[in-house]
From Swiss-Prot:
Keywords: Cytoplasm, Methyltransferase, rRNA processing, S-adenosyl-L-methionine, Transferase. This is Ribosomal RNA small subunit methyltransferase G. Belongs to the methyltransferase superfamily. RNA methyltransferase RsmG family. It holds the Pfam family GidB. Its EC number is 2.1.1.170.
Length: 195
């Protein structure tokens, strides 16, 4: 990670610590691990963005993990990716807008439930700590362009979630080990269809 990205992400870390006690951006038990557990965990997703990525939609963005982190990395690498955060909690949306403004990243924030969001589809859909895979695919279906990619940061139950999702969806999944937790994985799903 370059020095400019690290500097911006340290600013983001301070914003999370400042706002989180009031609006629960991250669990209080993880405040001391914000950099490793949340920011670096989100940053690893950047390397999985396809070279064709130009519009990334983040589902249930909450505290901006991973969308703000990805926006910072894209800015400092000269990538013209448009990021959209969908979040139903207006307080968290205020935080996301503050972070986007202070960090000067290309991020639009939509205050809406995911199912009701009126946004132009994207070619990458991301999510972290939001819902089981079957629900994530349900959310992603109307928001993803044909040929788009889903990148989900998942925990230790990812294999079971994928097996359960295959009861309702047809898809192939690729798993990549997390660099921040041996119990976690990055799940990549390309085309998917209702079974």
């Amino acid at each position: 990670m370059d020095a400019a990205s690290r500097c911006d992400l340290k600013v983001f870390e301070r914003l999370i610590r400042k706002w989180s006690p009031r609006i629960n951006l991250v669990a209080p038990s993880t405040y001391d691990q914000t950099w490793e557990r949340h920011i670096l965990d989100s940053a690893q997703l950047y390397d999985f963005l396809p070279s064709t990525a130009d519009k990334v939609i983040d589902l249930g963005s909450g505290g901006g993990l991973p969308v703000v982190v990805l926006g910072v990395l894209a800015k400092h690498r000269g990538c013209r990716i448009k990021f959209t955060a969908i979040e139903s909690d207006a307080r968290k949306c205020a935080f996301l807008r503050t972070a986007a403004r202070e960090l000067q990243i290309n991020l639009s924030v939509i205050t809406s439930r995911i199912e009701a969001a009126n946004v132009e589809p994207g070619n990458v859909i991301t999510a972290r700590a939001l819902a089981p895979v079957s629900k994530l695919l349900e959310f992603a279906e109307p928001l993803r362009v044909a040929g788009g990619t889903c990148l989900f940061l998942k925990g230790e139950n990812v294999q079971n979630e994928v097996s359960e999702a295959k009861n309702s969806w047809q898809f192939e999944a690729k798993y990549y080990p997390s660099v921040t937790s041996e119990k976690s994985a990055i799940l990549e799903i390309g085309e998917f269809y209702r079974a």
